[in-house]
Amino acid sequence: MSHRIRHLSCLACRRKKVKCNRQYPCTRCLKYGEACTYDERDNRKKRHSLSYLHSLESQLARLESFIMTLKNSDPEGRDEMLKSVVFSDHLTEPNDQEVKSEGPIEYPVFLNVQDSKTVSFYGPTSAYDLSLPDITKDNKTTWNFQASYSPMVSECLKLFFRYQYSQFLFVYRESFLSDYYYNFHDGFYCTEHLIYAICAIGASMSDDENISRHSKSYYDASWQKLLEFGLDRSHLTSVQCLLCLGYYDIGMGNTSLGWLLSGLAFRMGQDLGFQLNPENWYIDNSPAISSADSDIRRRVFWGSYVADKFIGFIMGRPTMLKRSDASIPGSNQLPEFAGLEEFKLNVTDYMSLTDFSVCDAVALFVDLSDIADSILLNMFSPTSKNRATNINCVLSNLGKYNLELMNWHYKLPDTISWRTIDLKKDRIPNLCAVSLYYHLIRICLNRPFLSRKEVTANDLTPKTICTDSINEIVTVIRAHRTANGLRYSTLYIVYAAIVSCSVILLLRDMCTDSELLTLNNDMMFFIEVLKECSQTWKLAQRSIVLIENTLKGKTNSQSTSEFVSPISDTENGSSSQQVSEAKDIVEPSDVLDELQKFDLLPENDDNFQTFQAFYGGPPIILSPNLYEKKLNEKTL
């Protein structure tokens, strides 16, 4: 007698509908001397596949639409429609050998474990055989870095997290500082090269010259320590370090190097599989990564995702990280610890005003980044279908994205929807950064269409949308300047000012006298903003020169005295000379003569020869006039 338990009752018990013990032979058949046979086919599990059901629903919808059209057609039209019907593409039922389960298909995933927290990821198409030993492991020694608690380093860290955190969300403040002060994660999230990278950014905005002059030294030290650590040794802090250095270079006007470093960071992150949910990874029936480490990886990925979209958008270049490749959940907030208040800005007001958290800011940045990426792909990509059609299709797509941005703003919960009164007081720094990003996207989307009179969304023209966003940007920057000063500005402020100036330059030729007065005031405001930001970011300093070079080309037809606010500084920032600003009216020739005394533009760099090529953004692909000219040629 076999003791193997079957999944189904024997045929005799099933026929008589009595209980069977599912052994062979079963006790009932053995008792009554009947033949005990089993049918191994389990028809209970024979169900239609999910794809078959979806296809059937789709075909049913098409059939219903066809019948309704047929009903409303004239006799001749019905005959033509019936002749066109073909049933050769009908759906077929999958046979018994097809998919057995409705669950997701499990693809092979390979994890190369480097240490208790670092895992390299290889997907199902990987050509690497991970059963082979990793020859690089023995050549690397584990680090034993002890954090330096010098007052200068501490001050740089405080400046970074107080004023720049909304721009560097891929650095998880709680995990970094808990490792820096308490070695909570055994120093895993606080490596030497990351500390120096953060200090380079923090030192650049210090009012103390003894600290600010070390900014470039911190940058060089970070890069050197990163090379010693090993670029072939993928690590989360190396991803964060590369992104910090990339942002630093972009802020100093070295856009090509910043682009390369950020791209290297994203590739290293993908090597770590940081876009995937590590909670599904098991090694020897144990989680490959702890829950706390998983939460930190979430923040690093989504912060990197926002950085990728922002950098790609302001440069008008393709992005690397795709939403469709990510399975990792949203970011969670780690517990705070004593002393963290020193690294926050306006802690009392911030906490009492709203429950808006850093995780909320990350979620909003991610949503806006998705919209920005879609705009870049579908509106300004050289292979975009809309670019290949006439202007009406382009304007229709423009209206769609304007409406999407408006709906996103209007649907924000009351607890996180920004109000003008909140922006004026600058009491929620992260929310103000989100607001600047939102208006930056709106302006870059509508800037190539300023001369169009067509209404694109909610009875608004591209010109109206851009001017409204400029007014909001002025409100935010004024509040930040009053509360903190523009020495501590982020690149969101710098690029918002640059893009606003570009719109004002375009609007000068299509405005009334009353509008021109407002544009003059706004231009003066933004030039002063860039001048103050140039103390931290050389990008702002160079942009002023290029704005003035653009105005130089217009002096033959219109005086630029209302716009020009002279500045001067040397290229390496080691010394500066103050240009007299006592004149109430500055003649264009006087300003240009002063500017020629200083070498503010990089040598042999064609990227900085024109303002349009410098400020980046989607319109860098085609200038506004050329963009519309090509579209009109398509319609002829």
From Swiss-Prot:
**GO MF terms on file?**
DNA-binding transcription factor activity, RNA polymerase II-specific; RNA polymerase II cis-regulatory region sequence-specific DNA binding; zinc ion binding
The cross-references to InterPro entries, in alphabetical order and at most eight, read: Transcr_Regulatory_Elem (IPR051615), Transcription_factor_dom_fun (IPR007219), Zn2-C6_fun-type_DNA-bd_sf (IPR036864), Zn2Cys6_DnaBD (IPR001138)
Q: Name one GO cellular component term.
A: nucleus
Q: What is its main location?
A: cytoplasm
Q: Which CDD domains match?
A: fungal_TF_MHR (cd12148), GAL4 (cd00067)
DNA-binding region residue numbers: 10-36
Task: Tell me which PROSITE patterns the record gives.
Answer: ZN2_CY6_FUNGAL_1, ZN2_CY6_FUNGAL_2
Q: Where is this region: Disordered?
A: 556-581
Say which domain of life the source belongs to: Eukaryota
Biased composition (Polar residues) is annotated at 556-580
Q: Does the keyword Cytoplasm apply?
A: yes
Listed under GO biological process in this entry are:
DNA-templated transcription; regulation of transcription by RNA polymerase II
* Assigned keywords, A-Z: Cytoplasm, DNA-binding, Metal-binding, Nucleus, Transcription, Transcription regulation, Zinc
Q: Where in the cell is it found?
A: Cytoplasm; Nucleus
PANTHER family membership: TY1 ENHANCER ACTIVATOR
Q: What is this protein called?
A: Uncharacterized transcriptional regulatory protein C757.04
